[in-house]
Amino acid sequence: MRILLLGEYSNVHATLAAGLKILGHEVMVASNRDFWKNYPCDIELVRGNSIFAGFKLWLKVLYNLHRFKNFDIVQIINPMFLELKADKHVSILKYLVKHNQKLVLGAYGMDYYWVSENLIHKPLRYSDFNIGEKIRPDKDALIARKDWLG
């Protein structure tokens, strides 16, 4: 199988790729290397720090877009798989759906949107932030809420 893994969180995609390659699959990882952790990847999609960093990353994504097609499975690490604005994500997602067999959304890592969604709409019966309709009051849940929502 041909598998594309987009994004990275705590070495999940890099180690998954290594295991899948051992099993004989063709795997490509495109990520920002999870920032300072510098995990391995095949296509580096790191956003710089300059005033034009977002534009440069967008150009890099467009330049590599042809490499993101004809896969049996594409897994994105979470809804914010690139350090770009949401409208750019929508364009990339449409391309991925059109040019690949299956698209899988992971829920790795944590970001503002994940925390907010789990607190407000509670799409999961059990999450880091809720048990059923009840918001979790434990220390870890409170720390994560403060870190991401202020």
Predicted regions and their residues:
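Short, hinge-like loop/turn segments at secondary-structure boundaries
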Residues: 45-48, 121-125
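N-terminal subdomain of nucleotide-sugar transferases
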Residues: 1-41, 99-101
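Short alpha-helical segments and helix-capping/turn motifs at coil-helix boundaries
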Residues: 11-15, 58-62, 87-96, 142-147
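Short, solvent-exposed beta-strand-terminating loops
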Residues: 30-38, 104-123
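Short N-terminal targeting/anchoring amphipathic segment
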Residues: 2-6, 65-88, 102-106
